[in-house]
Amino acid sequence: MIRLIASDLDGTLIGKDFRFRPRTLHALQAARAAGIQIVFVTGRPSRWLTPIREQTDFDSYAICSNGAVIYHLGADEVETVNGAPAHAIRSAHELLQPVFPNATYTLETVDTVYIQGPYEGGEVLEGARVVEQHLLGALDGFAGEQVIKYLVHVPGMDPDILQARVAQTVGELVSVTRGVVGEPLIEMGSKTVNKGYTLAQFAARHGIEAHEVMAFGDMPND
C-alpha cells in the first residue's frame, strides 16, 4: 500500500507559471484524504515555495535544493540542512574556473545568493539576499556554513556536453546534475546528497518503507 507520494514540481505537477492545474490539485487532495502523505521534491530553493503554500493547505514537507534542505510547508520554516562543505565547493570552483572562464557561477545558502560573473537577475534571485562577489572570497567567510547549491551557467553551450565536462572535471568532489530543460545550467552539491537520498532518510524517519513510496519526476536530478 502506498503511504507517501513524492513528486517533482516543475514539469511534473506544475507548469512554467508555477500553478497547479485544477485536476492535479484535486488528485493531490484526494490522495491526502485517503491518508497518503504528499512530499514535494524539487531542485528549487525553499524561498521559492510561497506560491505552493498559497495554493494548498498541506501541513507537510518539501525536499528542496536537490535534497539539501527539508522545509515544512505548514510552518514555513527550514527544518534541516544537509549541504556541501565549503572546502569541497572551493576545490570544485578552482577546477572549473579555468575550464569555463566566462561562465556565471552562483553559490547558494538558505537565504543568500553569491554571484560571480554576468547575470540578469529575475526569478533565480527572488526572495534572496544577493551578493556580487568572487566566490573564493565568499567562501573565505564561511565559518562552518553549508553550501546548499553551487551552479555554473555557460550561455550557448549544449547542456548535455556541459554536464559531461563538469562531471569529468569535478565529479569526484561534488554531485553534478541539472534540472532545467534545455538550459546550460549545471547544479552541484554535496557528493552524498540528492533527492533520492534525502527522501529515503525522510521516509525512514516516518516509518515508511521503500515499497510504500511512489516517486516521480521528469529531469536528470529526479
Protein language model features and the residues they cover:
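A short acidic, helix-capping loop that chelates divalent metal ions and anchors anionic groups
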Residues: 13, 71-73, 78-79, 183-187
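Conserved acidic, metal-coordinating active-site core of Asp-based
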Residues: 102-216, 220-222
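Conserved strand-loop elements at the edges of beta-sheets that form or border functional pockets
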Residues: 7, 43, 64, 178-181
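Hydrophobic "anchor" residues on beta-strands that sit immediately upstream
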Residues: 4, 61, 214
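Asp-based phosphoryl-transfer active-site loop
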Residues: 3-17
